[in-house]
Amino acid sequence: MSGFLLVTLVAALYSGCSVADPQISFKPPEYVEEMPAREVEESFGNAGSLFGQGDNPLFADRRAMKLNDLVTVIINETASASSSGKKDLSETSSSTMNGPSVTFGGPSQSIGNAVNKLNNFTSFGLSTGNNNSTFAGSGTQQRQESFTTTVSARIIKVMENGNYFIEGGREILINGEKQIMRLTGVIRPYDIGRNNTINSRYIADAKIMYETQGEIKKSTEKGWGTKVLESVWPF
């Protein structure tokens, strides 16, 4: 019974102190949901024209323009950060206090002698000496990450202002290791190249996720016991 209570206590402690993995919500931004979709206008070319609108016209713009059209996204993200800090503190203090002194200017010699004896008795001083306190600290942090790949996305909504809300994803399973990639965002049709590609730097409200699942990921993660100790360790 005591063993069961111990396991329950550890599980509750772990669930309460463990830090959840970062997550991304791929829900479209509010303005995308609130903005009406553009009405589809069917246009047909003149009979015999080389610039047709069929499935395989001789000359046509190959860029994505309509709902459910595909566009290739070239993801080329680089993030770098550098920060440094330095702090120096110094403090010095000292104090001295002398004993009291009594003076007498009267004609009585006996009183004068008594005053002198009293001054000799109280001629002491108090000194706290010098107190020095110093602190020096400095720190530097540098970080650089890059991620490059391509993924096809689909036009989910053509908004009233002509912009596209796109969504794409890819899952790859190789030798028990699963790679998952997903992205969403808003693009302008003018930023799509002639080869129907767009760079990720032109995507507004971009949300890009890439993660792996499998034994390799498990082997690089800390055990739950280590996570519990780190979450409650105060030092």
Swiss-Prot record:
InterPro entries: Flag_Lring. GO terms for cellular component: bacterial-type flagellum basal body, distal rod, L ring; cell outer membrane. GO terms for molecular function: cytoskeletal motor activity. It is found in: Cell outer membrane; Bacterial flagellum basal body. Residues 1-16 form the signal peptide. Residues 91-104 have a biased composition (Polar residues). Keywords: Bacterial flagellum, Cell outer membrane, Lipoprotein, Membrane, Palmitate, Signal. Its main location: membrane. It is a lipid-anchor. GO terms for biological process: bacterial-type flagellum-dependent cell motility. A lipid is attached at residue 17 (S-diacylglycerol cysteine). A lipid is attached at residue 17 (N-palmitoyl cysteine). Residues 83-104 are annotated as: Disordered. NCBIfam families: PRK00249.1-3 (NF001303). The basal body constitutes a major portion of the flagellar organelle and consists of four rings (L,P,S, and M) mounted on a central rod. Belongs to the FlgH family. Assembles around the rod to form the L-ring and probably protects the motor/basal body from shearing forces during rotation. This is Flagellar L-ring protein. It comes from Wolinella succinogenes (strain ATCC 29543 / DSM 1740 / CCUG 13145 / JCM 31913 / LMG 7466 / NCTC 11488 / FDC 602W). The lineage of its organism: Bacteria, Pseudomonadati, Campylobacterota, Epsilonproteobacteria, Campylobacterales.
